[in-house]
Amino acid sequence: MKPAHAAASWRNPLRDKRDKRLPRIAGPCGMVIFGVTGDLARKKVMPAVYDLANRGLLPPTFSLVGFARRDWSTQDFGQVVYNAVQEHCRTPFRQQNWDRLAEGFRFVPGTFDDDDAFAQLAETLEKLDAERGTGGNHAFYLAIPPKSFPVVCEQLHKSGLARPQGDRWSRVVIEKPFGHDLASARELNKAVNAVFPEEAVFRIDHYLGKETVQNILALRFANQLFDPIWNAHYVDHVQITMAEDIGLGGRAGYYDGIGAARDVIQNHLMQLLALTAMEEPVSFHPAALQAEKIKVLSATRLAEPLDQTTSRGQYAAGWQGGEKVVGLLDEEGFAEDSTTETFAAITLEVDTRRWAGVPFYLRTGKRLGRRVTEIALVFRRAPHLPFDATMTDELGTNAMVIRVQPDEGVTLRFGSKVPGTAMEVRDVNMDFSYGSAFAEDSPEAYERLILDVLLGEPSLFPVNAEVELAWEILDPALEHWAAHGTPDAYEAGTWGPESSLEMLRRTGREWRRP
């Protein structure tokens, strides 16, 4: 059977490119997953592939190849994918769609330094090109520790899989953390780019795949309502919070030595800051979006002195959800003298005309009060209030809160008169909820991002410069913490250490209670 070659810019010839009503469907292609035995592949990647197929967004001849150090047959691999899909898929299970997807499954056993295994992988993909018409177009998903990226990329290069000929394409997908600091990030980027050109590298930040994060662009640039007040004249400060209520039991191998700042602030929260603070791009072309994010990150720096504008903590024993939980140092796998922070908060300044003088407060942590991610623009108080103090006792500051998860949506908080004969003003909320406004469920972030990889659409993926600028911003705080003692303890189920509360109180502000 003659291979079916498809151009990198494959388009459905029956569809008008201006028609936005129909979803984009990937052309002939396949995907190889390295690290198929890990949690990421099992809980996120495999279910997302099935959900895309179930929604009709993958080509009928799509192939999925697993690579791991296991003595498995293709049938064994298929069972692993089946179990993952049954447990974690978002859409209903349909046997017919599953059977069609499973026809494209293959498995290659081997280690990352095994030349023969990669030769077998190349042979397997060549057969799939001939038998299923994948067209020589393959995405390589590295669901593996970053230390293994260079050796896998080199093996893909040696086996001829990294640089396809003609109109075929090869793309590599890598997961955070993108390095440990600026120096290691540059080293990692250099190793990956030695094999794959930058336009073929897709760095997954799953927060950018969330509908509410993408809605920041619509909220800001499709509505005249918000732009006039989206600046230092009206905004007092911005709070970006990612809180989790879970602990780290069983994750010591990954988390110990990394900590909350490297795990979340360097990537997720810096990207949320960039989307919140960037200027309007000339278009939604990937290069235009990336240019604006790079500009705002270039203008961002840590506020000083760092002992007053940053905070780090480590959760101690406490109560969470009605249960008594242990502290980090009593979790399995953590040394009793571990200095890994489970809470981090920093103050950033964005030195642009729009944001000069507006502090951006970023915080993240484990074992906090509840699971929530939000961006809150807190506005300045009205310059003159013709009310006496008793009328406004319960009045706070106006705020716009973008809820990323859970209960995705937007809340506007403002003052309103309480019904009655007296002039009493109290805060009220105006709510927009995705779940109420739209009948269709939001797709899982990995669905959108994997589809974008297969389509060659890089808008939602950070480039080298963004990654390195984020490290450049964060590194001074990491170095300061390393040189100054241990993290402050905070009780599980609370909202972080006292030092984080004091960080805002020094300036007359308070953290929002999500």
From Swiss-Prot:
One of its GO terms (biological process) is glucose metabolic process. The keyword Oxidoreductase applies. The active site is at residue 268. It holds the Pfam family G6PD_C. It comes from the Bacteria. Substrate binds at residues 206, 210, 244, 263, 366. The keyword Transcription does not apply. InterPro entries: G6P_DH, G6P_DH_AS, G6P_DH_C, G6P_DH_NAD-bd, NAD(P)-bd_dom_sf. NADP(+) binds at residues 69, 176. It is an enzyme of class 1 (oxidoreductase). One of its GO terms (molecular function) is NADP binding. Its EC number is 1.1.1.49. GO terms for cellular component: cytosol; plasma membrane. Keywords: Carbohydrate metabolism, Glucose metabolism, NADP, Oxidoreductase. It catalyses: D-glucose 6-phosphate + NADP(+) = 6-phospho-D-glucono-1,5-lactone + NADPH + H(+). Pathway: Carbohydrate degradation; pentose phosphate pathway; D-ribulose 5-phosphate from D-glucose 6-phosphate (oxidative stage): step 1/3. PANTHER family: GLUCOSE-6-PHOSPHATE 1-DEHYDROGENASE, GLUCOSE-6-PHOSPHATE 1-DEHYDROGENASE G6PD. Belongs to the glucose-6-phosphate dehydrogenase family. Catalyzes the oxidation of glucose 6-phosphate to 6-phosphogluconolactone. HAMAP family: G6PD (MF_00966). This is Glucose-6-phosphate 1-dehydrogenase 2. It comes from Mycobacterium tuberculosis (strain ATCC 25618 / H37Rv).
